[in-house]
Amino acid sequence: MEPTAAPDDSSSDHPERRRGPSRRTVVLGALGAAVVLGAGIPVTLRLLDRPTGKLVTPLLASKPFYAAHRGGSLDWPEMSLYAYQQSVAHGIDALEMSLARTSDGVWFGLHDPTLDRTSGTDAFVASEHTWAEVQQHRILPQNTVDHRQPSRPYLKFESLVEAYGTTHTIFVDPKVVDPQYYPELFALMTKLVEKPKETFIAKGYGFLPAWAEAASAEGLQTWGYYYGAEIEAESDRLVSTQGSWSILGLDYEATAADWTLVRSYGKPVIGHIIPSKAAATTALGHGARGLMVSGVTQVLG
């Protein structure tokens, strides 16, 4: 029997607290800061010796490539504009966003059905509230390595795409949204960028391929993430679902045998969810093409 929801894709590691900026960080006093128009949020300028982002075709031709899980969920309040700005400043190749949809049809970054974990609310179901009501809350830093940093506003999907849709691949996971709204999401993607196939990759839990099948029909690349322990328990479900995904994913803690099995399908494999350089080294050693990274400052430094 298939599960009704994907398991939590949070990192299980807790790396040491973030250290100061590396010697390659741009010195703001010398070079100034970029300011997001209309938001007034200072952004660290891109590190000078890092590449810019990659759209889908060059991303999948790269090895390794790096995607920011929820914008870098160990470092900054997840899926906030600030998190994505900082990941881009660190030279990340791609960005990832889980999506919820408000009662008035606004798509925004949220991993859960409610704001409870991210904002400390009590049974605040996103789909039952308007965007104006969501905006009354902030994303807390309690799930990051620096609990003292400021909380941040929730971010519309279209705002993320407007900022980075022409420079960075965006992994899109409508994790808690009813499939009846998928056509609406595809229409929004098409409206926001000229070439959706070069901006978006549909991301989802490997054992639940409905999103992949809908996205494939739109011509999008798809990434299905799996866990080694689940594959070992139900290997037949990997066999029956992997064909729906053009890219596969496996957790870095999976065994070498699990990695060999997943790689045997001849598709690119993304290691997840990477909190540290040690985890990155492990996944790359198993043959990962790319990494879905929660600890951006840990991995990219």
At which residue positions do the language-model features occur?
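N-terminal export signals
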Residues: 25-45
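Long, acidic (Asp/Glu-rich), low-complexity accessory segments flanking structured domains
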Residues: 41-74
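Structural preference for beta-strand elements that scaffold enzyme active sites
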Residues: 65-67, 94, 169-171, 199-201, ...
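Conserved, mostly hydrophobic/aromatic
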Residues: 69, 87, 98, 134, ...
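Catalytic domains of carbohydrate-active enzymes, especially glycoside hydrolases
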Residues: 86-99, 243-245
